[in-house]
């Protein structure tokens, strides 16, 4: 699928030394707008203070994007404080207020209707977060040496309409093989759940897998559990399943994410200046899972989200391929040509993928 993204960053805004950023990402079904302001030296010992405002729209409601049908509008603002604990690592604490509005669509699955019936369709949540990050990368873009990793715990606080948490880890390592060839290993893990009166992770906070920055060779967000098609009365008066045109169960995401991979970075032949180019052969692997697949029931008592697999490495999707990233004045242009090696049932493949504004 086509993903367009761009950002403008000024590291010394009006000579103050503060950082201002404006970001925009658009795809067929999602738009994200973000404004950020960071004072990197709020105190003399390097404590930073940041603010951000964001607006996101995700609309699977009317589009044929092979994902369970719904739309969510999110508006929020946050503040964060960062503490350096060494030259390469820091702790970050944040607090965000976020308003979410859910809209159901023509092919909305039972799990979404069930959640909306329990919790309503509009939520104001206050999220507190704590994170640790470390980086020894030699470059911010198209790095070739070093490593980076981060761990973040985010949870809603008392006074929120919903009670849930998410724990995420990201890491990557660059290991030079020769002067021009580099091995890169990367992984991303995530787990979320509800607590208190909220049963499970809210569906719109689910993890998804497939596509760029995930498992290339598969359509965006189409790996993992499938939803339960709703039943209703058709134009003939008969009760039947409300499904899309091909009657396939639609991807619903999950509360567990496992993905990673390895790639060999090498120079593109016959190109003298390689500073703005990255070429690789890669192996991607990953999937999302529902840890409560056999526990959740719909309002009619039937099993919810029956189209899901046990959390197991044997149930991971995988692909191999080649990728190219070219950093231009408009932002990074990334291309991937991938072939699925292990394809889960109902997974949607996409051999060629293109992105503007993202790197892998």
Language-model-derived ranges and their functions:
Residues 26-28, 178, 283, 326-330:
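A generic beta-sheet turn/junction motif
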């Amino acid at each position: 699928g086509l993903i367009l993204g761009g950002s403008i960053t000024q590291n010394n805004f009006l000579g103050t030394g503060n950082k201002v950023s404006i970001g925009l990402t658009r795809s067929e079904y999602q738009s994200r707008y973000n404004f950020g302001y960071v004072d990197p030296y709020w105190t003399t010992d390097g404590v930073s203070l940041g603010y951000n405002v964001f607006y996101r729209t995700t609309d699977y409601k009317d589009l044929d994007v092979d994902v369970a049908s719904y739309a969510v509008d999110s508006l929020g603002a946050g503040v964060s404080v960062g503490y350096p604990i060494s030259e390469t690592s820091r702790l970050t604490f944040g607090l965000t207020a976020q308003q979410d509005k859910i809209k159901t669509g023509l092919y909305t699955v039972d799990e979404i209707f069930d959640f909306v019936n329990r919790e309503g369709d509009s939520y104001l949540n206050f999220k507190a977060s704590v994170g640790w990050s470390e980086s020894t990368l030699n470059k911010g873009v198209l790095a070739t040496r070093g490593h980076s990793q981060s761990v973040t715990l985010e949870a809603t606080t008392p006074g929120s309409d919903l009670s849930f948490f998410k724990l995420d880890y990201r890491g990557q390592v660059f290991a030079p093989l020769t002067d021009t060839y580099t091995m890169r290993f990367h992984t991303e893990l995530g787990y979320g759940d509800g607590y208190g009166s909220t049963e499970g992770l809210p569906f719109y906070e689910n993890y998804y897998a497939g596509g760029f920055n995930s498992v290339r060779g598969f359509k965006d967000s189409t790996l993992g559990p499938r939803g339960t098609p709703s039943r209703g009365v058709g134009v003939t008066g008969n009760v039947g399943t409300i499904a899309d045109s091909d009657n396939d169960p639609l991807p619903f995401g999950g509360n567990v994410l496992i993905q990673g991979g390895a790639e060999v970075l090498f120079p593109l032949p016959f190109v003298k200046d390689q500073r703005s180019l990255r070429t690789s052969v890669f192996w991607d692997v990953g999937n999302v899972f529902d840890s409560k697949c056999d526990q959740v029931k719909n309002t009619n008592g039937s099993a919810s989200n029956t189209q899901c697999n046990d959390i197991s490495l044997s149930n991971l999707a995988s692909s191999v391929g080649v990728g190219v990233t070219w950093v231009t004045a408009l932002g990074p242009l990334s291309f991937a040509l991938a072939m699925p090696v292990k394809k889960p049932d109902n997974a949607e493949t996409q051999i060629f993928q293109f992105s503007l504004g993202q790197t892998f």
